[in-house]
Amino acid sequence: MSAWTMGAQGLDKRGSFFKLIDTIASEIGELKREMVQTDISRENGLEPSETHSMVRHKDGGYSEDKDGKTCPRDSGYDSLSNRLSILDRLLHTHPIWLQLSLSEEEAAEVLQAQPPGIFLVRKSSKMQKKVLSLRLPCEFGAPLKEFTIKESTYTFSLEGSGISFADLFRLIAFYCISRDVLPFTLKLPYAISTAKTESQLEELAQLGLNFWSSSADNKPLNSPPPHRPLPSAGICPASLRQLCLINGVHSIKTRTPSELECSQTNGALCFINPLFLKVHSQDLSTGPKRPSTRTPNANGTERPRSPPPRPPPPAINSLHTSPGLSRTEPQTSMPETVNHSKHGNVALLGTKPTPIPPPRLKKQASFLEAESSAKTLTARRPSRRSEPEPELELELEMGTAGHAGGAPPRDAPGDCTRAPPPGSESQPPPCHGARQRLSDMSLSTSSSDSLEFDRSMPLYGYEADTTSSLEDYEGESDQETMAPPIKSKKKRNSSFVLPKLVKSQLRKMSGVFSSFMTPEKRMVRRIAELSRDKCTYFGCLVQDYVSFLKENKECHVSSTDMLQTIRQFMTQVKNYLSQSSELDPPIESLIPEDQIDVVLEKAMHKCILKPLKGHVEAMLKDFHTADGSWKQLKENLQLVRQRNPQELGVFAPTPDLMELEKIKLKFMTMQKMYSPEKKVMLLLRVCKLIYTVMENNSGRMYGADDFLPVLTYVIAQCDMLELDTEIEYMMELLDPSLLHGEGGYYLTSAYGALSLIKNFQEEQAARLLSSEARDTLRQWHKRRTTNRTIPSVDDFQNYLRVAFQEVNSGCTGKTLLVRPYITTEDVCQLCAEKFKVEDPEEYSLFLFVDETWQQLAEDTYPQKIKAELHSRPQPHIFHFVYKRIKSDPYGVIFQNGEDLTPS
């Protein structure tokens, strides 16, 4: 057995997600077969009105068969015809099922009258976490069960599950089609699952919580399970069979790519897993050749059916406008690409832009089609595919569901050739599975769109600098104001010339990349758009303040007063926005709670500081020019530059001219930014570069006492007066929670270096800060921390020091990462793992304070207790101790003079 096959088996054992993918793929393939009845009936000489038509007319209705009979069908089948995926329905109706303020008793009262499978998402007051409340059948005993939703850095997942999602909507959409850790899949209310249009969903959403007690959801509790309509015997081939239902899931056969018909438009829509492409490519090359499909013509004779003509490349503005376009042409058949290509509607799926990115597959297909126009349409053997790297295995496993068929064209089994002439019956057309599937999937309206993951699909043709986090950090917000970074280009000798069409598509790829934004960036953009809308209270608040500040230049007496006022306004607006209902969907559904403040701070930078950047710079310059501080600084900069480094107290190696030019370029880049947080990031890079020069040229480590004179020397050599206002800008506008880390330390160092230059005198060595500069720093620190009576968890970096007491081994301690919503029960589980306790049920977490012991209850929050103890006027020495419950209450923790560092 080859190593690749063994690796594939290993992946298959732990990749249960792949089985789900194959199931969904075959399911969609069967659905597509059932939905081509109109096309088949025409070939058999039948009128469309004699079939079970799924044709959507302009009036939004659906035609029935001749008898007027209709068959019930499930909501997933309706989603295919209505182009409303599960994710669309969840997004439009979140005021119904997303009830974060609902109590446990109220949720139970709502779900008691609902059929099994109906759900709510609320926030538990006990755990301070979001929970999924699920209605259970009677045989489960309890009518309701709650599943905890875990929130990590920008991801959501259910407790006990290994699958994470970018936001709450995608999590719920996934569990509507797969149960994973749930006892069964979630079920949408009857009115939501049967709604035909977005306007109907919006009408339901306006009811909010009252939906559950209204007559809108009037499906009987014991109604039979819906099923899909049976295809007519005279219309559908014998291979189309009624699918059996097992627990609501169709029992279907999983097939390999070699078994799938991929040369016809009505072939099964499939997901080809790139991990097993090499294995199945052998089946494609050695398997039996299929005869060309034949269809009867008007005379009754058979003629070979040709593959459909390739759709033309998308319109020039299709990549930018497709998410917002509406459908205006009647759709005759789902897999039919000819009519769609004539009207330029190849890649249109959605009818209304939503806060989530549009489906990626249609854009990927559009780009691949444009790329393929430059290549000769000839069949070729499948290229070798290297084994995926270990760090990419999880990404492939998670991304295959939402982005199947998204592999590069060269990894596909082969390319389709043009239609053979009628005489060439014996030679079947070569098959191009991936290309055909991309074309079909661009027209697919299946609910699998809800499985798209933002960060799992690779960006082909996009080169990102992953060696530094700053490039990612500077990404979207400053692209309008920053000059493009200079990157080294490698000269490549190639005789291949890209056609103009491909070049045009490559230029528009930036529009495609916007669909890959993380929920954080989407929320920042949403808040920025809201700030420009004066129809909202938040927009009026921001626009009025920006206009007032620009029109009233005399309202501030100093630069510090102006910056403090802006910072105070940002804090107030951020607090309002965190409790406002103007954000739709709510920020809690897209961003984990411990990251909400960070995202709101970035949004404040974009919607307040960005429009004020030019005004603030001009005002700072006017203030410092009027008080004469810049004139004095300019003279002192010239004086310091004339001194030797040793006269400035520099006894470490200094940067050379080339390195000074790099530092000056970073300072110039800093001036173009409006975010104080990003300015600090660049300042940290400058300080890191200086430290690197000092250590590399001497071979020894240096401390802060040696660094400050070198930083003073570097600032003087850069000769930039604007650094004075840049440092003041950062010190006053930076979020106070960021002043306690590395950024605050080096920001203070830069302020001290400038103060040395401002107060430089010939008769004294510039080694010590003046008393005036020290007083300024003390006042600044006091001002930034006055209003923070109770320290937030960010002050302590989410760390908790826990001591572990054993009678035999004494006392040891560990620093654990404990977030604010982590309960004592969770901390005890973490301690049991860290300290390797064999019987954790006999241990608990205790608080030792004021010579007394107190066992903490399981539902308490150690970080909140820690914050309260730190905020007391008179500090108390306290310790968190993990020890046996039945032991000496005083123990030996502080015997023999041993003391632990306070938490």
Curated annotation (Swiss-Prot):
Regions of biased composition (Polar residues) lie at 318-338
Which portions of the sequence form the region Disordered? 44-73, 282-455, 471-491
Indicate the segments forming the Ras-associating domain, all copies.
796-887
What main location does UniProt list? cytoplasm
Entry keyword annotation includes Transit peptide:
no
One Pfam assignment: VPS9
Q: Where is the composition biased (Basic and acidic residues)?
A: 56-73
The record's annotation in SUPFAM superfamilies points to:
SH2 domain, Ubiquitin-like, VPS9 domain
Q: Where in the cell is it found?
A: Cytoplasm
Q: Which InterPro entries does the record match to this protein?
A: RA_dom (IPR000159), RIN2_SH2 (IPR035868), SH2 (IPR000980), SH2_dom_sf (IPR036860), Ubiquitin-like_domsf (IPR029071), VPS9 (IPR003123), Vps9-like (IPR045046), VPS9_dom_sf (IPR037191)
SH2 domain: residues covered: 97-190
**Biased-composition ranges for Low complexity?**
439-450
Q: Where is this region: Interaction with RAB5B?
A: 506-775
MF terms per GO, please?
Answer: GTPase activator activity; guanyl-nucleotide exchange factor activity
Q: Which residues carry this modification: Phosphoserine?
A: S366, S510
| Cysteine disulfide links | none
Positions where Phosphothreonine occurs in the chain: T518
GO CC terms, sorted: cytoplasm
Record carries keyword Disulfide bond: no
Give the protein's function: Ras effector protein. May function as an upstream activator and/or downstream effector for RAB5B in endocytic pathway. May function as a guanine nucleotide exchange (GEF) of RAB5B, required for activating the RAB5 proteins by exchanging bound GDP for free GTP.
Give the protein's recorded name.
Ras and Rab interactor 2
Native source organism of the sequence: Mus musculus (Mouse)
